[in-house]
Amino acid sequence: MSEVYEGAIGIDLGTTYSCVAVWETANVEIIPNDQGARTTPSFVAFTETERLVGDAAKNQAAMNPRNTVFDAKRLIGRRYEDPETQKDIKHWPFKVIDNNGIPTIEVNYLGEKKQFTAQEISAMVLTKMKEISEAKLNKRVEKAVITVPAYFSDSQRAATKDAGAIAGLNVLRIINEPTAAAIAYGLDAKSDKPKNVLIFDLGGGTFDVSLLKIQGGVFEVLATAGDTHLGGEDFDNALVEHFIQEFKRKQKIDISDDPRALRRLRSACERAKRALSSVTQTTVEVDSLSNGIDFSSSITRARFEDINATTFKATIDPVAKVLKDSKVPKADVHDIVLVGGSTRIPKVQRLVSDFFDGRALNKSINPDEAVAYGAAVQAAVLTNKADSDKTQDLLLLDVVPLSLGVAMEGNVFGVVCPRNTPIPTIKKRTFTTVADNQTTVTFPVYQGERVNCAENEPLGEFQLTGIPPMPRGQAELEATFELDANGILKVTAVEKTTGRSAHIEITNSVGHLSSTKIQEMIENADKFKQQDKDFAKKLEAKSQLESYISNIETTISEPNVMMKLKRGDKSKIEAQLAECMSQLELEDTNTDALRKAELRLKRTVQKAFASLR
């Protein structure tokens, strides 16, 4: 397709599932994938012959656990030694190695060991979402708005933007998931009176709570809180651990080091978790779980709630935090909107309702699609495709999720930009030298809420040199923190007497890639895409040849043909059939060889049958 789509798509890049939407004819359309599903598993699988993305990857996960990658969102922009990363590695069947502090996924693909970053895996999922939209629009898609959890750090946001670039997308904006969901909620319910709306977004792997003031088309985030490492996957993990222990107790077999058994048990636990949102008891069944032993166990909703009690309760702390940060009393929250598949869990709904003194919760928007919906609206606004009264005054005012600053003497965190500051923004703070005649100052940049920098996240550092020698404390060094609409940071420092300056765009933090590295990954992605196309063509040629062989074998076996066909001609056809079968059995055969074999067989058949006329 040569025609380029003028607008942009909205993508909800989820931990477990992703969703894509587009603004068309004054409305948002959620685009189904080739299976007809409106959400696509965020899974990528590698085999000896091909790469699979989405449903096809998830469906074969139990047979190929070590080479089926999921949860890339839990790795993106994180360091290998991060405690959360280490915790996750214990649950994943695929291998994650330390590559200079960057967690890197190692798989077997096309008979070789290959290594991929979380950005590259995410880019493969984004490419799939891009292709889904292109199939619908019949145009090439080049622009997108991608959503991230509100509590994502600068590194995680930048890494997500890089993933978009690797997928061949111009990422117009990174927007926060709860803000996108608020658009889905508020677009059709505009009011001139201000409304305080709490978005409770509990997905497959991340959790956000945002409080917004919505008035007309203005969506102003007052405060945000959450946990980038809490969601449905954690509830699955707890169930899996529960049943591992039960199987061990009953059968004296430990399956914790058996990736295939774990994948099958995880799938059964995920189904049970979903079922328990609508029934009070269900059964977890896995045929031949280990050593030919079938596993079957019933679980009640009450037991499921008990197993996850601590995790469920942890979802309420961020709710209290946003109300405290925004100084908005419970009673002044007009609506509590549930977003994310995990909000279907009755216990979660009860906890939220109880916190708000038994208030009814708003379930008016589709929890799986709301975020992509809001992203599509923002995409339409940014590309001037939003041609509706509903969107003409739309304005998003988001906030910084975590404080930003620099390390001062004693490794104390000097906050420059406090959390919940509206973005885009520019914040300044003056620092000074700590030693006499100091001519160089290093500015280590951090993000977090702790006093000790060691307990916050390092984003990068830069040096300001050429400071005139003077007694300690006399130099005036002004640090400027500039945050763009994506929440991505640029820091500048100026020595006021000389005007000498230095700056850093946070690009050397873990997760953010250099432009050279991104280009290299784009080329790799194109190479994999070509390999996928080549494999599909080979499969088609193989299938076509097999079908033709079958037809010819049937034809020459028919009595009336056998009687008329010359013995020599039949022998030639049989020889060609044998040659074609040999070609099909070759491991390293290619599309060209298969097509040539089919052509030779066709010519032999045509010559033989010409003599029958």
From Swiss-Prot:
One GO term describing the cellular component: cytoplasm
Gene Ontology molecular function, alphabetical: ATP binding; ATP hydrolysis activity; ATP-dependent protein folding chaperone; heat shock protein binding; protein folding chaperone; unfolded protein binding
Amino-acid positions noted as binding ATP in the UniProt annotation, renumbered to this chain: 15-17, 73, 204-206, 270-277, 341
Keyword Cytoplasm: yes
Motif (Nuclear export signal): 573-581
Localization (cell): Cytoplasm
Region ranges (Nucleotide binding domain (NBD)): 1-390
Catalysis performed (reactions): ATP + H2O = ADP + phosphate + H(+)
Primary location class: cytoplasm
Pfam families on file: HSP70
Modified residues (Phosphoserine): S153, S155, S256, S353, S501, S514, S515
Keyword Cell wall biogenesis/degradation annotated: no
Substrate binding domain (SBD): annotated span: 402-612
Coiled-coil features, chain-numbered ranges: none
Modified residues (Phosphotyrosine): Y151
Phosphothreonine: modified positions: T40, T516
One Gene Ontology biological process: translation
EC number: 3.6.4.10
Keywords: ATP-binding, Chaperone, Cytoplasm, Hydrolase, Nucleotide-binding, Phosphoprotein, Protein biosynthesis
Subunit structure: Binds to ribosomes. Binds close to the ribosomal tunnel exit via contacts with both ribosomal proteins and rRNA. Directly interacts with nascent polypeptides. This interaction is dependent on the ribosome-associated complex (RAC). Interacts with pss1. Interacts with fes1.
Free-text function comment from the UniProt entry: Ribosome-bound, Hsp70-type chaperone that assists in the cotranslational folding of newly synthesized proteins in the cytosol. Stimulates folding by interacting with nascent chains, binding to short, largely hydrophobic sequences exposed by unfolded proteins, thereby stabilizing longer, more slowly translated, and aggregation-prone nascent polypeptides and domains that cannot fold stably until fully synthesized. The Hsp70-protein substrate interaction depends on ATP-binding and on allosteric regulation between the NBD and the SBD.
Family: Belongs to the heat shock protein 70 family. Ssb-type Hsp70 subfamily.
UniProt protein name: Ribosome-associated molecular chaperone sks2
Gene that encodes the chain: sks2
